[in-house]
């Protein structure tokens, strides 16, 4: 049986090759050779699959020269104009197709595509509603799928899912429509509704592997992990070449905190898509969770070999070294990550933390400035920088940063409290008390920042007297 299937496939491929050669020779020699409509469609599909658009257009024009009244070929011509973004010409050719077969569903689908590309979503929807009235139950699935796409572009996700579910019920064996459902279910969190629909599909056809996959995702969405794993197992039993099911199975095991099973599933997924560098990274995360830092680093580096700009992988390598208290090695990798994403707040904050552990005061301050300027709107970053300068007795600089913070971040009372502390340390007691009084008037509740940063200042007699005065 297998040999017969192979022979048929081989013969079909040989026939297509011969057909393409015959067509290309006729074009080259400018000879007209009659080809039936089926042969012409096969030629077009061949060029379309290979994205050879110039040759595809030649094939369409050739087909039209022999079949000028064929609505199929006229629609093909309209699609070619759509590809070229010549929208008026595309509409004109669709109008021509309608003269020969006004009920042809593809006329409406291609016209909707034109409206979608030109951001005329309401017009696209109107065309598809017209098409819905003309189609039989099987064709309705394609119309509903296109409608779902329009609603999604309109950001009406519940309606997009509702229509897509209708498409699935009309055409339950269409894998593309089933695949589209997965992300819409996640966006709308309609997991129970998805589970109900896909169970109904599986009652009719238990070999529908995409339905098993979607059912598994629905169960995972409501944390029914054992049921999700069972559904994924059925999916694999029917189609063990489907890469995404291994990824989703791995994700469920990860959420169950079973790192060893997660790694096992990720390895299988990686066999199906070795070019996907994220698998090595994910395996690294699992080993890191298992506190096997050497293996974690091995897989992070493997991900980096595939993608040298994988900043997250450099960062995770740094984290494994930090846990082992190998701070210099950690910093090397943190800085590589930061070089690839220069304003990443997590990277900057971690580098600051390590420099503080190593008591590299100047380096820590340098990166604190970088953190502040990466997000000038974050109050806590300014406070931490001013506090660091204050603790390093760099009072003049701390005072300048207070003024800059007020301008860049906002006129927060915290900056006035910090200013009062700095002025006091600089021996400017009168100015310090004025700044403190202004801060207390502005926002008394924030005065506890004084206690957090300098307990001695907070308990100073004059400070206590002023605080008590405004403690109403």
Where are these regions (language model features)?
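Structural marker of alpha-solenoid helical repeat scaffolds
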Residues: 66, 99-101, 134-136, 170, ...
